[in-house]
Every structure is written in structure tokens, then in C-alpha cells.
């Protein structure tokens, strides 16, 4: 059974552990400020629990441009042993629902092509923004 729960000051360190286990430090390094700012984003950061074990997390941030809101996914990670159990999908659905409830018009993520996860997002309704594609990053977005 998959359950989601808030990230709070008492369990914040778990986010760091999940990210360290899921992301190659040569590709992605999260600065200390990323973790410090996590508590302030409220519902835009959640843990995923599988049978009461914390196995994943999503962390987003809200952006406002010309009175229009967008949500950027900064981290979406599931521990390798728990992948292919719809946990990542549940975290992504939660992020999209929370973004829509907050009146965001779009949700997006910038990825390193080295991560090789673009197809996962495309299968969940995201599209590649070809105009922002570089050799170091690809932007995928979904209208809400």
C-alpha cells in the first residue's frame, strides 16, 4: 500500500538520504539550501511510504510569471528497490493535483539527458520543449 505524507523538520534528513541513493552526484547535486527551503514549500514536498517504509519523495517549487503560476519539480525520486510499483506515478499525480489546486497552469521538470527518464514523463502526459533543449538539459512540461 502506498501512502503519502508531509516532509517536516523532524524527517527532513530522509529526503537527503533518498536523493543520495537515487541520483548520481556527478549528474545532480542538491545544495544545502534545497533542503533548508523544503519545509517552506508545504504541500509541494511529500514522502511516499510503501508498507509504512519511506521509499520516495517529490519536491517542487512554485514560480510566478506575469500573474501566472507554474510548478517546477526539483526532485522526484524512488529508491531503486521500490521502482516499478507505481510509487513514482503516485508522487507525480500528487504533484500535478497539488499544482492544479494552487491554480498553476503548468508543471515542468528540467532533466539531464544522462538520467534517461524523459520517456517515463512522456508516458504520463509531459511533452518535451524542443526550444529549450540543450546538451545539458531537457525541459518537459504538462499543462494543467
Swiss-Prot record:
Q: Domain of life, per the record?
A: Eukaryota
Q: What is this protein called?
A: Uncharacterized N-acetyltransferase C663.13c
Q: Which family does it belong to?
A: Belongs to the acetyltransferase family.
Query: Which GO BP terms, alphabetically?
Result: mitotic sister chromatid cohesion; protein maturation
What UniProt keywords are attached to this protein's entry?
Acyltransferase, Cytoplasm, Nucleus, Transferase
Query: Main EC class of this protein?
Result: transferase
What species does this protein belong to?
A: Schizosaccharomyces pombe (strain 972 / ATCC 24843)
Spell out the PANTHER family in the cross-references: N-ALPHA-ACETYLTRANSFERASE (PTHR42919), N-ALPHA-ACETYLTRANSFERASE 50 (PTHR42919:SF8)
Q: What is its EC number?
A: 2.3.1.-
Query: One GO CC term of this entry?
Result: NatA complex
Residue ranges of every copy of the N-acetyltransferase domain listed in the record: 2-144
**GO molecular-function annotation terms?**
protein-N-terminal amino-acid acetyltransferase activity
Protein localization: Cytoplasm; Nucleus
Concerning Gene3D superfamilies, the annotation shows: 3.40.630.30
Question: Could you confirm whether the keyword Acyltransferase appears in this record?
Answer: yes
In terms of PROSITE patterns, this protein maps to: GNAT
Q: What InterPro entries does the database record attribute to this sequence?
A: Acyl_CoA_acyltransferase (IPR016181), GNAT_dom (IPR000182), N-term/lysine_N-AcTrnsfr (IPR051556)
